[in-house]
Amino acid sequence: MIKLIATDMDGTLLNAGHEITTMNQEAIKFAQANGITVVIATGRAFYEAQTPVAETDLKVPYICLNGAEVREESFNIMSTSHLNHDLVHKITTALKNNHIYYQIYTNRGIYTEDPKRDLAIYIDIAERAGQKADVAKIRNNIQKRIDNGTLKVVDNYDSIEDIPGELIMKVLAFDADLSKIDQVGQALASSPNLAVSSSSRGNLEITHSDAQKGIALSAIAHQLGIDLTDVVAIGDNLNDISMLERVGYPVAMNNATDEVKHIAKYVTETNENSGVGKAIMKILKEENNLEV
């Protein structure tokens, strides 16, 4: 019987407009009304993850930054895992030596050295996903994040570690040269204290090895007294694999990578077609004998 459901956001719960469809919302509420906990598990920082959820009346716990931060439904922080100075130095040295652009995510915001480079990257990400990039909208969103303080511009990333209370949680790297970024990712992944994954082609998400979606989801299940065989995880990309491979019911989106589809028990429809909502309703009907 399913007792816990975890869903990724980008490419999974969210459509191309970064919205949670009505069907997805209704399916989540249906699960919650039947005593099932639904968790969002994302590579996004909390303030990025909460934005599309705030446009609905959903209330859920969050696994953020691939597990580097876990928040209760009330937004209280349950756990964090950050990168120490030596690990940050190892990561940034490898990226700089290979001329790979990156951003730094902390417990207080996202840091960039070059907002213009960010704009070009976000346009490229949209186009790689088969979307028509709305340059004006992307530029406005970047400026809005700078204005509200969630995207911070610095001359040099080295200054971040000098800020009292600032903890580096994730490094997000981008490069159009897929061979190069894969090679650097494999090299960094050889460190026993680093977890390296990806949320889209051409990026690397680097966290402490303790900060993985699967580890965070396992901790939540344990806290709730739920066996992992009674858990559903839904995702589309490499940073979802750590949770998909742990649960009894791994679900891949139809737009997922082949690696994700390979370990899934069930492949649902795409994120554009409310694949999350359809998967939830199908599984709860079959596994929990609920009338849907």
Identify the residue ranges that each predicted region occupies:
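Active-site metal-binding loops of divalent metal-dependent hydrolases
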Residues: 9, 44, 235-237
